[in-house]
Amino acid sequence: MNTLLQTIADGDPLSRPEAEEAMATMMSGSARDEHIAALLMGLRTRGETLDELVGFTKTMREFAVSVETDDPQTIDLCGTGGDGASTFNISTTASFIAAGAGATVAKHGNRSVSSQSGSADVLEALGVQIDLEKEGVEHCLHEAGIAFLFAPFFHPAMRHVMPVRKALGVRTFFNILGPLCNPAGVTRQIVGAFDTSTAQTMVRILAELDADHVITLHADDGLDEVSISASTTLFEYDASDQNPVPRSHEVGPERHDLDRASISTLEGGTAQQNASILRNILSGEDQGPRRDVALLNAAYALHVSDQYADLDACLEAAAESIDSGAALDALNTLASVSKEAKSE
């Protein structure tokens, strides 16, 4: 580790193998806290290179508890958090809509970062058993077509760096890595970022690590979701393209014939309040902006699953998922199956 720290102190980049070595040293518990702090702050000050981030991500994935899925088109919707907007749980709601439309969803998440209610918090309030280990999650994926992968259970090696991260109290490259390290090994993702530059970096990392179809994004109103209150910058990588490279484009709700709405209409609250909002959307009771933003994010998730012809078809499928009751069924089934898995 001393040699790697000297390289950083000299202002030189780590090679990809050196980044892998540094991460393996941290994840195995072999690094001293002061060395971890020096590495994190040295790279934060200088700025990480793509090779460094790819090496870190690759190794963090190797240290995760692996979850098997039968469906190679399994998707995930997650984000870095930290957008400070305190919206309801948009990507979690969209996950159930996507599952109701036929996608297999391995939802990777944690407790709250910047709001009162993270994905784990709202799912717990909805009666989903979140503290499932590998076998329980695999059971949910097989029986319900959707599962929640509670990050602390699947990234146990992170305990070696958590005290330093908490003590530093600033964003580091670990804030970027988490959403890129789904334990189910998904190659199809929607990943929201806390700024546009980070979204662009994340798509390049995923492209280097054999993604099939991914979109990273950041909205002009600050959301790490596809927004209906502002335009959203998307960075898309599709390995099936004739010339597969990350491409960027901007979308507003008008592109999908949806009305713009103030970001205040998307405001959430406590886990219990967000659970009520989510259930009202899935039941079809809420026909307003919250439904629209959930549909939009579900549509882009279905888009990266490549199960529908185009985005318009994805949006129609998302609406049908709610209107047919399939999205609500996906929630109720996960709640039931997750409890079965916990009791086994």
Swiss-Prot record:
Coiled coil: none annotated. Anthranilate 1 binds at residues 79, 110. Keywords: Amino-acid biosynthesis, Aromatic amino acid biosynthesis, Glycosyltransferase, Magnesium, Metal-binding, Transferase, Tryptophan biosynthesis. It is an enzyme of class 2 (transferase). Binds 2 magnesium ions per monomer. Mg(2+) 2 binds at residues 224-225. Anthranilate 2 binds at residue 165. Its EC number is 2.4.2.18. 5-phospho-alpha-D-ribose 1-diphosphate binds at residues 79, 82-83, 87, 89-92, 107-115, 119. GO terms for cellular component: cytosol. Mg(2+) 1 binds at residues 91, 225. It comes from the Bacteria. Pfam families: Glycos_trans_3N, Glycos_transf_3. It catalyses: N-(5-phospho-beta-D-ribosyl)anthranilate + diphosphate = 5-phospho-alpha-D-ribose 1-diphosphate + anthranilate. GO terms for biological process: L-tryptophan biosynthetic process. Its cofactor is Mg(2+). One of its GO terms (molecular function) is magnesium ion binding. Pathway: Amino-acid biosynthesis; L-tryptophan biosynthesis; L-tryptophan from chorismate: step 2/5. Belongs to the anthranilate phosphoribosyltransferase family. Homodimer. PANTHER family: ANTHRANILATE PHOSPHORIBOSYLTRANSFERASE (PTHR43285:SF2). Catalyzes the transfer of the phosphoribosyl group of 5-phosphorylribose-1-pyrophosphate (PRPP) to anthranilate to yield N-(5'-phosphoribosyl)-anthranilate (PRA). This is Anthranilate phosphoribosyltransferase. The gene is trpD.
